[in-house]
UniProtKB/Swiss-Prot annotation:
Coiled coil segments of this chain: none
PANTHER family associated with the record: ATP-BINDING CASSETTE TRANSPORTER
Residue stretches of biased makeup (Basic and acidic residues): 1178-1193
Gene: MDR1
Protein name per the record: ABC multidrug transporter MDR1
Organism of derivation: Trichophyton rubrum (strain ATCC MYA-4607 / CBS 118892)
InterPro entries: AAA+_ATPase, ABC2_TM, ABC_trans_N, ABC_transporter-like_ATP-bd, ABC_transporter-like_CS, ABCG_dom, ABCG_PDR_1, ABCG_PDR_2
Length: 1566
């Protein structure tokens, strides 16, 4: 039915403004004087008499703050001193004058209600009272003439636009090929259409008011808050949109006073290794004003304020605890949220916008947080907006105003006390016990709202209808009139701007420009950030130490590799290699800074928005803090590599060497920092860094000499800072030195009749000048050394300047609207055209519809509000009863035992819905994990039975577990995820057709038809929070759990309506025979009544109550009231009532020990009796039915082959639908191979040309590290899903998981090998090679890339994350390429390292490729490579060299008949050249076989490491196994080294002892 335009209901008053006006004037005279913020406060005598803008406050001054008490921190002397100074204000000259009314001090004491020396002013004392402290602080500031900014905000015609449509299509590997057939998308049209996020908003918020922002997820709440603060970042306001702060335009306000309006994002971003105290003291120091009360120092002032905020938000006990994050252990999630809150409070901003800041807090903590905000508004005059999804009535009543959003449209703005009446007068029904906030949000949900009788066809239905109704209402007219008065009171850009400037200027430090939004000067910012940088380093000192140790170890390895290099011409190549290594390792050690800068970018952006500091101040501080550390590391690193690597031991040359290497470190650090600052994402930065490193390495001058560079790429040499450093170091090393000729030609010549076969040699001289050698070989000159230093310093200054500039300019990231992603050709009809959302929801609900109202008894039907409008009768009824008795869970933390669960008993019957609740830290999730058999550590005792029998291996497969984290594979669709679960978790006896039909039933049950073909995606680009939660539930239902369904916080992060939908759906499942046990977070009263039974836990995992809830919670409430609790009010939420009486919240306490009461109660004894009865009844049934038909229940539902097929198909699918990964892989191989190929394009047959050809092969292997870094994150994504959800559910085996990931990588690696082969070898070697040799090269290329993938999986298999594995893989790769025989010939390796050349897999890859490419290639020496000399008088060149030729010399004489200027080339074929590196054509197939042996080893090692480290981790034996393996491998290594090197050393272990090793290993495995 078509929607009718809404009309105001005739005959009914819309507002109560007449009586409201009389209330507000009385109320404002009694309200506490507002001030600027919670710690620096200026009073005002203004009386706000606007009848619309101020509602009556039901709280007496200070009465509502009784619960805002704090946890006492340990006293610190300086804080005690500050508190004592504050308590002795009478000694301060500015506050001691005596007046007729008793003096200012007496006024302050009377107003604050404290006496001198009162401990309520000391945040280190338990008696500290924040409200009294704030009142005292206000008047001290007034007495000293300290002003603080305060302002309201008005917005008119606010319209915000974003890019993106409601629907996007999923890209696949072939999408780029199909793009030409979609020219509209190719040109960008239709790809990112403009979307209106906020439509024409109007409103005004006076200073000191609290605004509640209500709306369902996706309605625009976050965008609205960002718009108020001016932090749209990629979104756009329409030109007509007006936002001003008491007359100051948003543009001017954000430019000059940015930190005065701040936005608190829903996510927390902090430096994880800083402590809570360091984090908050930094925030306080960054906003410390220049003029401070009582003249205290900056440090004392900021420390005191940080302590105050920690005390207010219950963080005092965490002062020395790291903040932490998902990977670093620190404070809890709730405490981290409070750190974010305290940080904003310390910013002192007069306008604060909080985006769902109560998420993750229990109801008691959320209420205390809201009351603290009220203190800031009433006492400090702070204007605050809070978006909240689940708000209790107590929280709602604290707010002054509320705005309701519906699909980006404003449908109400006004005082909180009239909002409910407005919608009721519109025609909507509010059920009893539903909170006002829930009611206001519910009217925006077609499936939840209820129309009053007689108004079904008169109420608005769509968002546009609601907006139209609002704009026609009297409330909106009064709002617009009030906005006109607001604008008249604060004319644009007039007096208020000047006041703000004056107040801001008073707070600014010296040397800060008047229009700067910052309070402290740039030098102060840099100093503050530098101190913080060192605090971060100290907090993460283990990582810093590990990094430095790895660098030092690399220096030791490289130095020892070139140890004892001969000081002859044979050492020229080694000197070039060691200097190349030194400059390269010094220069590239800073590449890890890219990840570090991206990790801190969200924090820097946040702090810049808070006006803590300039982004370039943090960047400059990072540089300053790094220089001493880099200096020390460079000093140790270069001392080792210089003296161990055989370089000249001259003080002057060493210090020049160190100078250039250190400047190179700084220059490359500046380049990598600039790269990170100039890009938007880590993949962008790393991709550019990879290409840049390849270019820097090739065009350093070592791998490819300048004279052999082609013009199309030679320009890279001139912009390569490493090239200038390499030239300087090489000429510095050889300058002024002469090197004995190692290979004179002929060796028996005398006088002028011989020459050294080295570039730069002079005929007849037995030594070669180092200067002549570098000039002839590289065209280098010692005269360039200081020129190069100047060029390096120029690079350094340039990139530092660019880095600081882009750091300041490139902070924001583009924002776009949320959208669903579908596969092409699978767009639902509902998205192909418009639809009536009300009709889609089943029409308008009626208040007396029994399907809509909450059930009136525990067995009543919960109907249409559940996600599914269809029946759930397809759920098979269950008969099994799950019981647990005296369950105890103990773990050991830091050597101390700790009990998490303490003798908990209970049961879950089929057809019942049981709630698991408790205070924060009570162990709700821990109990759920223990019952579901998902714990991996500790000791669990007690009885857990199904029908009186112990749990078998199939228990986890037969239960469903809906985890709190909605973890899904982002590339799969909803239907595919459900089918995957059904395929693997339903028994093999069920046909695939039946499984898929059941999946369709699940989709209908959960009302997922509209997005069943949608791709899961990532937040913002895929399913929203509610849809993800439904999918999580659907995945478990698709498995058809035969026993029961566990759910952990299924409503977490959802709005109240979505929570209601989820719980009522669970109600329907229970009514149809499903057994359900669910933890629930902060349920509303009507939601709580959906449950049949409650298990309530106190801290320490102790039981407070287990039993029936009863109708209207009577059974539950009677228990608490009969045992001494205060009666529950008729309108009070029973769930919140329970939390309050047991002392939940940071400051909550209870006089009654409820776990002890429960233990001694009759109800507890009844539970034990009931458990006995259940066990007795089920035992009799078991005896009557005999043994179970399933004698040996299997761990998995499907056989191994079926598992492997399903999982491999899904992994293939994931790869195919991740084109960025596949194309990134292919483009890396293609671009790198083409770049290398055309850099070494068609090298000639000179000795240098052969060396360059060998280096081209070597350079191909260097992309190994980038390939490995690409593969590992993809593996981790699959592994996280498997280990967190699918392995505990026994969906498939860990062996299947590993094999599927190995198998899927291989085809892509084969294709990548073909691409690299064609792109590299044809440009480098041409097409003249035989087809056989081209085929061998192709086989080696394919093998190399398959080896890379299996190596990556071997490394990541047992390690926790890709970052850790990446570091290890890079180190191992460095060793492999170092010892492959290219950079140091095998015969020149020290004996200790020769075995490394043999065990390096790259040795055999390079050997096979080089032998195949250069076999039988004729050598034609370049002019500077020839040994040119005159033969004795009367002899020809052939006659003179006949003796040398007869001795089997490998060279070739070019002019045998000449009698002068004999030209002798030391080599005649490529095989001779390769022989020096022990590379032989005859070994090509042996090397190929060894390569496959390494691949097989990688696969077996992958399986073994994963099993030992991750599968058996719960047994506690992996560490013992690894220890045994490592110990005996070291012994075996000694034996193998002795065998390979041919030395007569024996393995220290006898053969019998090695046999014993295998026995020990087998015992551990068994």
């Amino acid at each position: 039915m078509a929607s009718q335009p809404p009309q105001p209901l005739s005959g009914q008053p819309v507002t109560q403004y007449e009586e409201y006006q009389s209330e507000v004037i009385t109320e404002t005279t009694n309200r506490p004087t507002p001030a600027a913020d919670i710690y620096e406060i200026t009073p005002t005598n203004d009386v706000m008499d606007d009848r619309y803008e101020h509602e009556h406050d039901d709280y007496e001054s200070g009465a509502m703050y009784e619960t805002v008490r704090t946890w006492s921190p340990q006293s610190r002397p300086e804080l005690v001193r500050i508190a004592s100074v504050f308590s002795r204000v009478d000694s301060h000259p500015n506050v001691t004058p005596t007046t007729e009314d008793g003096g200012q001090l007496n006024r302050r004491d009377t107003l604050a209600g404290v006496k001198i020396g009162d401990p309520v002013l000391d945040p280190t004392k338990p008696e500290f009272d924040f409200y009294k402290w704030a009142r005292m602080f206000t008047h001290v500031m007034e007495n000293e003439g300290i002003k603080r900014n305060r302002t309201g905000v008005m917005f008119r015609n606010l319209t915000v636009l974003g890019s993106g449509s409601a629907v996007q299509y999923q890209d696949t590997f072939l999408s780029p090929f199909a793009a030409p057939f979609r020219p509209g998308e190719l040109c960008g049209k239709g790809r990112n259409p403009e979307k209106v996020i906020l439509h024409d908003f109007n409103g005004a918020i006076r200073e000191g008011e609290l605004l509640m922002v209500l709306g369902r997820p996706g309605s625009g709440c976050s965008t609205f808050l960002k718009a108020i603060c001016g932090e749209l970042h990629g979104l756009q306001k329409k030109k007509e949109s007006i936002i001003h702060y008491n007359g100051v335009s948003q543009h001017t306000f954000k430019k000059e006073l940015r930190g005065e309006a701040v936005y608190s994002a829903e996510d927390e971003h902090h430096f994880p290794h800083l402590t809570v105290g360091q984090t908050l003291e930094f925030a306080a120091a960054a906003r410390t004003p220049s003029k401070r009360v009582l003249g205290v120092s900056r440090k004392d002032f900021s420390t005191h304020l940080a302590r105050v905020m920690m005390s207010v938000f219950g963080l005092s006990h965490t002062y020395n605890t790291k903040v932490g994050d998902d990977y670093v252990r620190g404070v809890s999630g709730g405490e981290r949220k409070r750190v974010s809150i305290a940080e904003i409070a310390l910013s002192g901003a007069p306008i604060c916008c909080w985006d769902n800041s109560t998420r993750g807090l229990d109801s008691a903590t959320a209420l205390e947080f809201t009351k603290a905000l009220k203190i800031g508004s009433q006492v400090g005059g702070i204007t605050q907006c809070l978006a909240i999804y689940q708000a209790s009535q107590a929280i709602y009543d604290i707010f002054d105003k509320v705005i309701v959003l519906y699909e980006g449209r404003q449908i109400f703005f006004g005082p909180t006390r009239i909002a409910k009446q407005y919608f009721e007068e519109m025609g909507w029904y509010c059920p009893p016990r539903q909170t006002t906030a829930d009611f206001l949000t519910s009217v925006t949900n077609p499936k939840e709202r209820i129309a009053k009788e007689g108004y079904e066809n008169r109420v608005p239905r769509t968002a546009v209808d609601f907006e139209r109704y609002w704009k026609q209402s009297q409330n909106n007219k009064l709002l617009l009139a009030n906005m006109d008065r607001f604008e008249a009171e604060y004319p644009p850009e007039e007096g208020h701007l000047q006041k703000l400037r004056e107040t801001h200027g008073q707070a600014q430090a010296k040397h800060t420009t008047s229009k700067s939004p910052y309070r402290i000067s740039v030098p102060m910012q840099v100093k503050l950030c530098t101190v913080r940088a060192y605090q971060r380093l100290w907090g993460d000192k283990s990582s810093t130490i590990a990094t430095n140790i790895s660098q030092i170890m690399m220096a030791l390895i490289i130095g020892s590799l070139f140890f004892d290099t001969p000081q002859t011409t044979d050492g020229f190549f080694a000197k070039g290699s060691v200097i190349f290594f030194a400059i390269l390792l010094n220069g590239l050690m800073s590449i890890t800074e890219i990840n570090g800068l991206y990790a801190q970018r969200p924090i820097v952006v946040k702090h810049v928005n808070f006006a803590f500091y300039h982004a370039y101040s943090e960047a400059l501080a990072g540089i300053v803090a790094d220089i001493p550390i880099k200096f020390l590391l460079a000093l140790v690193f270069n001392i080792i590599i210089y003296f161990l690597g055989g370089l000249e031991r001259s003080a002057a040359k060493f210090f020049i060497f160190f100078l250039f290497t250190f400047i190179t470190i700084l220059t490359m650090s500046a380049i990598f920092r600039t790269l990170a600052a100039a890009t938007k994402t880590i993949p962008q930065a790393l991709a550019l860094a990879g290409v840049m490193i390849l270019a820097l390495v090739i065009y350093t001058g070592f791998a490819l000499q300048p004279s052999y560079m082609h013009p199309w790429f030679k320009w890279i040499l001139y912009i390569n800072p490493i090239a200038y450093a390499y030239e300087a170091l090489l000429v510095n090393e050889v300058h002024g030195n002469r090197y004995r000729c190692a290979t004179p030609v002929p060796p028996y010549g005398g006088g002028k009749n011989f020459a050294c076969a080295v570039a730069g040699a002079v005929p007849g001289e037995m030594s070669v000048s180092g200067d002549a050698w570098v000039e002839s070989s590289y065209d280098y000159s010692y005269a360039h050394i200081w020129r190069n230093l100047g060029i390096l310093l120029g690079f350094l200054a340039f990139f530092y300047f660019v880095y600081l500039m882009v750091s300041e300019l490139n902070l924001s990231s583009a924002s776009s609207a949320e959208f669903l992603v579908f596969r092409r050709g699978h767009l639902p009809k509902s998205f192909q055209g418009s639809k009536d959302e009300e009709a889609a929801a089943g029409g308008v609900m009626h208040p007396n519809d029994p399907a809509r109202l909450p059930p009136t008894n525990t067995n009543g039907a919960a109907g249409e509000t559940a996600p599914g409008g269809s029946t759930v009768a397809v759920i098979p009824p269950q008969k099994d009863i799950f019981t647990w008795r005296n369950v105890t869970y103990d773990i050991t933390i830091k050597g101390e035992p700790r009990r998490l669960l303490d003798n908990i008993s209970g049961w879950v019957r089929p057809g019942t819905l049981t709630a698991l609740m408790g205070v924060s830290g009570a162990g709700k999730t821990t109990l759920l994990d223990a019952l579901a058999q998902r714990t991996t550590m500790g000791v669990i005792t007690g009885d857990m039975l199904v029908n009186g029998r112990p749990l078998d291996s199939s228990f986890q497969r037969k239960t469903g577990y809906v985890q709190q984290q909605d973890l899904h594979l982002e590339t799969t669709t909803v239907r595919e995820a459900l089918r995957f679960s059904a395929d693997l978790r339903q028994p093999k006896s069920v046909s695939r057709k039946e499984k898929y039909e059941y999946v369709e039933d699940v989709i209908k049950m959960l009302s997922m038809e509209d997005f069943s073909e949608a791709v899961v995606g990532n937040p913002g680009e895929g399913l929203n929070v509610e849809q993800r939660k439904l999918l999580t539930i659907g995945v478990e239902l698709a498995a058809k759990p035969q026993l029961l369904l566990f759910l952990d916080e299924p409503t977490s992060g959802l709005d109240s309506q979505s929570s209601w939908s989820i719980v009522t759906f669970l109600r329907k499942l229970a009514d149809n025979g499903q057994a359900v046990l669910s933890t629930i977070h902060q349920p509303s009263g009507i939601l709580f009544e959906q449950f049949d039974r409650l298990l309530f836990l106190a801290k320490g995992g102790r039981t407070v109550y287990f039993g029936d809830i009863g109708k209207n919670s009577e059974t539950l409430l009677n228990y608490f009231e009969t045992h001494g609790a205060e009666p529950c009010g008729p309108s009070e939420n029973p769930a919140e009532y329970m939390l309050n009486i047991v002392g939940a919240g940071p400051s909550g306490k209870s006089k009654i020990d409820w776990p002890v009461v429960w233990k001694e109660s009759e109800e507890s004894r009844h539970v034990q009796q009931e458990l006995d009865q259940i066990q007795s009844e089920t035992s009799k049934k078991n005896e009557g039915h005999g043994q179970s038909a399933e004698k040996e229940p299997g761990e998995f539902a499907m056989p191994f082959t079926s598992q492997l097929y399903c999982v491999t198909t899904r992994v293939f699918q994931q790869y195919w639908r991740t084109p960025s990964y596949i194309w990134g892989k292919f483009l890396l191989g293609l671009a790198s191979a083409l770049f290398i190929g055309f850099s070494f394009f068609l090298q000639n047959s000179s000795m240098a040309g052969l060396q360059n050809s060998l280096f081209s092969i070597f350079m191909l292997t260097t992309i190994f590290s980038s390939l490995v870094q690409q593969i590992m994150p993809r593996f981790v994504t699959q592994r996280d899903l498997f280990e967190v959800r699918e392995r505990p559910s026994r969906a498939y085996s860990w062996k299947v998981f590993l094999l599927a990931n190995i198998i899927v990588e291989i085809p892509y690696q084969i294709l990548l090998g073909i691409i690299a082969w064609a792109s590299l070898f044809y440009p480098t070697f041409g097409a003249h090679l035989s087809s056989e040799r081209q085929g061998i090269l192709l086989l080696y290329c394919v093998q190399f890339f398959i080896f890379a993938s299996t190596f990556a999986q071997m490394i990541i298999a047992g390690l926790p994350d890709a970052e850790t594995a990446g570091g290890i893989a890079t180190t191992m790769f460095g060793l492999m390429v170092t010892f492959n025989g290219v950079l140091q010939k095998p015969n020149a390796l020290p004996g200790f390292w020769r075995f490394m050349w043999r065990v390096s897999p790259i040795t055999y890859t390079v050997g096979g490729l080089a032998a195949t490419s250069l076999h039988n290639r004729e050598v034609k020496c370049a002019q500077n490579e020839l040994a040119i000399f005159d033969p004795p008088t009367g002899a020809t060149c052939a006659q003179y060299l006949q003796k040398l030729v007869e001795a089997g010399a490998p060279g070739k004489l070019y002019n045998p008949t000449s009698t002068t200027q004999c030209q002798y080339c030391p080599l005649s074929s490529g095989d001779q050249f390769l022989g020096g590196s022990e590379i032989h054509w005859s070994d090509r197939w042996r090397n190929f076989g060894i390569g496959w042996a390494y691949i097989v080893f990688n696969i077996f090692a992958t399986v073994a490491l994963y099993y030992l480290i991750r599968v058996r981790k719960s047994s506690g034996r992996p560490n013992r196994i690894i220890s045994v393996i490592m110990y005996h491998l070291s012994r075996a290594g000694t034996y193998c080294r002795a065998f390979i090197t041919g030395r007569k050393e024996k393995c220290p272990r006898k053969r019998e002892q090695i046999v014993q090793t295998y026995k020990e290993f087998n015992m551990l495995l068994n």
